[in-house]
Amino acid sequence: MVVGVFDKFSCELNNSKPHVLLVNPSDMGNMGTIIRSILGFGIKDLSIISPCADIFNPKTIRASMGAIFKIRFKIYNSFEEYSAEHGNHNMFPFMLDGHKTLSINDCPKTDLYTLIYGNEASGLPASYQEVGQSIFIPQTKDVDSLNLPISVGIGCFMFTSTNPIK
């Protein structure tokens, strides 16, 4: 058996780098997978709106495969609280009724952005249509939505490919 022991820690986000923002994520395994995925694409700043899954839960830590120790994260009480600190970012909420369809040939070009994703079960509230430019990931009619970690991975791939992190 292998056991890891560490102290819980807190971080401040880098305001001059891209962020991923999760709004009320509830699944600890998904959160760990997302942490690992964003780091894989070079995004090292994760913001989370509470209530949310426990970032220090063993399931989250295991799913992150150690990536949690290489990112910065901060938990906020509301989107307004996040926006007050990072309002200089271009905001891109990912929604099933997003106004812009994400495509390889037409991904928004910007160096400073926040990719916003909603809860696994309910997505983002309609009010996020008014936040920045809402994005839709195209998919077939055979499914009603994509899994949250898959959506985050697609968004991170597209944005970091179009806007390499410096």
Model-predicted regions and their roles:
Residues 25-28, 62, 114, 119, ...:
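Short glycine- and Lys/Arg-enriched binding-loop motifs that mark or flank ligand-binding interfaces
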Residues 6, 10-98:
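RNA substrate-binding interface of SAM-dependent RNA methyltransferases
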Residues 1, 17, 112:
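Conserved catalytic motifs of the protein kinase core domain
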Residues 82-85, 102-104, 144-150:
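Short, charged, surface-exposed secondary-structure boundary motifs
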Residues 86-91, 107-110, 150, 154:
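Short, surface-exposed amphipathic charged segments that create phosphate/polyanion-binding patches used
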Residues 94-144:
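Active-site/ligand-binding-proximal alpha/beta "capping" segment
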Residues 3-5, 20-21, 47, 115, ...:
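Conserved beta-strand segments that form the floor/walls of ligand-binding pockets within enzyme
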Residues 4, 39-41, 55-69, 126-166:
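Structured adenosyl-cofactor binding patch, chiefly the S-adenosyl-L-methionine
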